[in-house]
């Protein structure tokens, strides 16, 4: 594994995914400062997710067919610019459009970057992909701190501070001579993959990833509001969101280690089984324990994350960009499509009641994952 290159990809991923985390971190601000209802605020999450859901596989297919070195830095800039433009406060429609621009940037970045990571990796690639995913998770975890820090600065300057990670990410993601040639269209097959496509397994894996996405994005969107509803303040809500994102970072690295010992599919199944009681604890246990359960739930839900990306690439070994666009992109973004429904239920009842359906989703993901095959290199 080319460690320096993977580290650069991971750092660049952090600078992009901080903006997907920022969308969730902005929800409490939009509710309190702009008087949005829960359903309206969750519609902001939908704006970032809906566009991503449609276009990520298209960007993945583009990356499979041709080398597009400009796409990664340009998408990084779009992700940051969109979030910064939320501060213009030109009305709900303009806010939705700004967040959609950010979502488009994230959507364009992920498939192309994930494909570069896999071609730069040695062996099965799940260790390299776990570090790449960790970079994204660090960005997620830092998002609440970035939002709180930037919005503590009065005026437009605070909002433009939100674009600082994107500026760094553009520098990190600038094309390097030889990097894109090594990962060009002729290098589409994953290392050691036989070239046989298992579309049925890929579809089942995609369903697993969708269920996981609904559970995690539902928690990340509403956990800060949930903590406030339980009597915590704004800082307590940000702490809960930080615990969730920090747990996801730990789970990503743990997934690679467990997969090396027990196999990817077995690790995915056990992680979802472990996630079920943790998500239940977030909803049912007293407030101090919510932070612990949030971290545990996120860790268990993120153990499968990078493993599902490499499984998808091995199920479709000649179309890594497309596979990444689905497993790393589309299925993750689809989780945001459920947010307005959760928000509408929260408006009608309470945030706690709205989160209750999420407790069964890890068990559903576990049941779907039971029939996933473990790819055998060279078979």
Positions of predicted regions on the chain:
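Extracytoplasmic gate region of multi-pass secondary transporters
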Residues: 23-24, 200-243, 249-250
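Conserved MFS/SLC helix-loop-helix module at the cytosolic interface between two early adjacent transmembrane helices
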Residues: 54-90
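Helix-to-loop junctions at the C-terminal end of transmembrane segments
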Residues: 55-67, 251-263, 346-347
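Structural signature of the two symmetry-related core transmembrane helices
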Residues: 70-84, 266-280, 359
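Cytoplasmic helix-loop-helix junction between adjacent transmembrane helices
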Residues: 98-135
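Helix-loop-helix hairpin linking two adjacent transmembrane segments in secondary transporters
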Residues: 132-178
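C-terminal transmembrane helical hairpin of 12-TM major facilitator-type secondary transporters
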Residues: 265-308
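A late C-terminal transmembrane helix in Major Facilitator Superfamily
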Residues: 315-349, 358
